[in-house]
Amino acid sequence: MSVNICELTYKEFSELVPHKVDTAILPIGTMEAHGCTNLGTDITIPEFIAREIAGKINALIAPTINYGITRSLLPYPGSMTVSQDSFIRYVGDVMESLFRAGFKKLVIINGHGGHIDELKKLAIEVWRKTGGKTVIIHWWELVEPMTREFFGEAGGHAGLDETAMVLAANPELVKPELCRDVIPYQFRAGTYVYPAAGPIILYKPGEGMPMFDLEKAKEYARKVVDLIADFIVVVFKGWEKNLAEKS
């Protein structure tokens, strides 16, 4: 039986939720320029992670939210956005609907830094309305120490970490030749630049440029998936033990 909710019949869903499966995974991304990877990089990575962790945490995967809040790279070709208000209302409605459908726990795999504050607010508000528990994974932040240990340097927007994950998910979506024509933008604290001065944004001087080693990318992706799954399991155990009487 499929782990994707949209591929189940309503009878199959009723047999699973919540008796056998009480957790849903919701990938969230946006459409945004990413150097030499696809415009949907922030979608591709959360969907890949969701597929890889579903079996590890006994979860079903909800349909992805593909449109998000794009800011600094919105002027670049192909970048798209929705308003902050629309995003909050829509994602909140989706979260509430998942809980009312029978899920008790929700894992949001977020692929875009522009959603961090909004998703935190939503997790709290939706809990107040439904009692549903949410864990939000900003994957690149959670795995940053491992990224530095694995590559010996930090990642960046459309940098080595995101490029490696897309490469592991679908090598055809990575176009190394495009990087030759891209001047990366080096972020500097104490400044604000709009629009961003490049579709590759580096946060540490001399660190984070994309890499294109497929085998190394696959190894990195495995570590990312394991780290995320392990963290979620710890959270679930904490909820089960410490909130059992309040659920």
Regions found by a protein language model. Name each.
Residues 1-85, 89-107, 113-247:
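Extended, histidine- and acidic-residue-enriched regions that form the cofactor-binding/catalytic faces
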